[in-house]
Amino acid sequence: MSEQNTNHESPEQNVAHDNIEHSDSILEETMKEFDPQHNSGEEMTIENEIDLDTFKARIAELEGEVKEAKEGTARANAEAYDAQKRMEQEADKSKKFALQKFARELLEIVDNLERAIENADANDPVAEGVQLTHKALLAVLHKNGIEVVDPQGEKFNADLHEAVDIDAEAEADTVGTVLQKGYSLNGRLLRPAMVRVGQ
């Protein structure tokens, strides 16, 4: 009798046994699902999915940082280029106009030489020497970017000319007499010409 009991399980025992087997198979499937070695190809575990999302987020973050770094480098390069250009322009301006004060003082010498030439006797050998000196000085000034502004007969320009009197014989708004020549340094006015202007 006891042998029959051991060989034949009751219906309740069969159900319990089936339930245990079913639970074991579910557990085994669940373990396989979370086992990275078991999952390959298109199968994804929740854990792997979480890791992949984290990984993608980190990649996006790093790409953003790289983009910011590239933009920062481009801005820094542009600023450095602009600064270099500004320095070159400033150096160029300094070269062009460093002699401005010195040149103005030289103009007084030119004026004195011109007055001496006007008042000298044409046959005087000293006057000839003064003329040669005047010519040589003007050549040096020209070589260094200093040009004569002699507006005789031109339209009056307040930016280039200084009107000190009226010339009754000249046409209206026209320079009649140049009392003192003007000069420019590399295209920039160094001294305006003193003139008489027609009304």
Swiss-Prot record:
InterPro entries: GrpE, GrpE_coiled_coil, GrpE_head
Keywords: Chaperone, Cytoplasm, Stress response
Record-linked CDD domains: GrpE
Cellular location(s): Cytoplasm
GO cellular component, one term: cytosol
A Gene Ontology molecular function term of the record: protein-folding chaperone binding
Major localisation: cytoplasm
PROSITE patterns membership: GRPE
Pfam families the record matches: GrpE
Biological process, per Gene Ontology: protein folding
Biased composition (Basic and acidic residues): 18-27
SUPFAM superfamilies: Coiled-coil domain of nucleotide exchange factor GrpE, Head domain of nucleotide exchange factor GrpE
Region described as Disordered: spans on this chain: 1-27
Signal sequence residues: none
Functional note: Participates actively in the response to hyperosmotic and heat shock by preventing the aggregation of stress-denatured proteins, in association with DnaK and GrpE. It is the nucleotide exchange factor for DnaK and may function as a thermosensor. Unfolded proteins bind initially to DnaJ; upon interaction with the DnaJ-bound protein, DnaK hydrolyzes its bound ATP, resulting in the formation of a stable complex. GrpE releases ADP from DnaK; ATP binding to DnaK triggers the release of the substrate protein, thus completing the reaction cycle.
Subunit structure: Homodimer.
Family: Belongs to the GrpE family.
Name of the protein in its database record: Protein GrpE
Organism: Psychrobacter sp. (strain St1)
Gene name of the record: grpE
